Amino acid sequence: MQTFIITSPVFNPYFNAALEEWLLTEFRKNELVKVIYFWQNANTIVVGRNQNTYAEVNLKELESDKVNLFRRFSGGGAVFHDLGNICFSIILPRTGKVMENAYEQTTRNVVKFLNSLNVPAVFHGRNDLEINNKKFSGLAEYIAKDRLLVHGTLLFDTDFSKLAKYLNVDKTKIASKGVDSVAKRVVNVKEYLPNWTTAKFLEEMINFFTVTEKAETIVLTKDALAKVEKRAKEHFQSWEWNFGKTYEYNFKNKRYFNNAGLFECNVQVEKGTVVDIKFYGDFLSVVDITPVTKKLIGQKYDYKTFEKLFNELDHFSDYFGSLKPEQLLGVIFDNK
C-alpha cells in the first residue's frame, strides 16, 4: 500500500479542516492508500462534533482576544490549539484489521518517534498518548465510506493558561444536553526536549515518518486547492456549522448591579436560535418589556447580534431603567 505525506501550508483552522476532509474523501478516491497529514492551527478553540458550543466556550473572551473557533467533524471534547501544538491525521483503508485497536495501531510510529528521542511516550487507555502518566495527545476517529481517519493533537509547547481562560464556563448555569469536556493532567513534550523548538520537532517527525513509511509527498493541484478553500469558507467557517448544530439548551443567569438592581434572564436556544427569552428583576422599567423579548426571539444567540439590537433600540432606559446595554449583555452571555 502506497503512503503519502502532506503538511498544511497555513495555520488557518478552517482551511486545515477542509484539507483534512478532502484528503479523507477525495484524494486518490477508490485507491488503497495511506495518508499522513500534519497541520497547525494558530490561536484556536476546537469543539467536538457533538458538543454544545455555548456550553463549552467563553465566547466573549474569544472575541476579545480574536481567537478562532471551529467545530471538527469527529467527536471528543473541546481543546485549545496554538503554534506550540501539532495536529496529525492518519487516513487508512477501512478493513477489519485496521478497525481493531485503531487508535493504538495508527499511532505506533508517533510513539516510536518519541521513544527514539528518549521520550518515554506510551499509548494509554482508550485514546490517549501519555508520558509518565500525563497526557500529551488525545485522539479521535471518523469513518467516511471505505476509509478510517484517526487524528490527534500533540502538545509540544502549548500555553496551558489559555485552556482555563477560553474553556472556563460555569457549567452550573447551563442545563446542556451536549458532552462536557473533562479536564485531564497534561504535559508538553518540550519538558523532555528543552532545547528543541516546535518547528524542529515537527521537521524531525516529518522526516521520521517519510523514512519509516517510505512516504511520497503530496503536492496540491490548483484545482484541489480551490476546492479546499471553497469548502473552508462555505462550510467550516460558517455560523451554521460552528453554532447552528448546537443542541437545544436552557441558560439561566442572575446578577445584582448597584446602579440598577437585581436582573435575571432565562434563555431557551434551539439550533443556535433564541426560541424564548424572559427577563426578571427589580430594575426600574417604565414600560412593558414584552416588545423587546419579541424582538429577540428568532435571533441568533450571538453577542454581536444582541449588541446591535440593543444599540438600535429606542429609549433603552424605558425598558431597563439604569441598566446599561453592556451590563444586560453581560448577564445574557455570562460575561463580567
From Swiss-Prot:
Localisation per UniProt entry: Cytoplasm
Annotated transmembrane regions: none
A single GO BP: protein modification process
Gene3D superfamilies: Bira Bifunctional Protein, Domain 2 (3.30.930.10), CO dehydrogenase flavoprotein, C-terminal domain (3.30.390.50)
Gene Ontology cellular component list: cytoplasm
The keyword ATP-binding is annotated on this UniProt entry: yes
Superkingdom of the organism of origin: Bacteria
Keywords: ATP-binding, Cytoplasm, Ligase, Nucleotide-binding
Residues at which (R)-lipoate binds: 135
Function: Catalyzes both the ATP-dependent activation of exogenously supplied lipoate to lipoyl-AMP and the transfer of the activated lipoyl onto the lipoyl domains of lipoate-dependent enzymes.
Protein name: Probable lipoate-protein ligase A
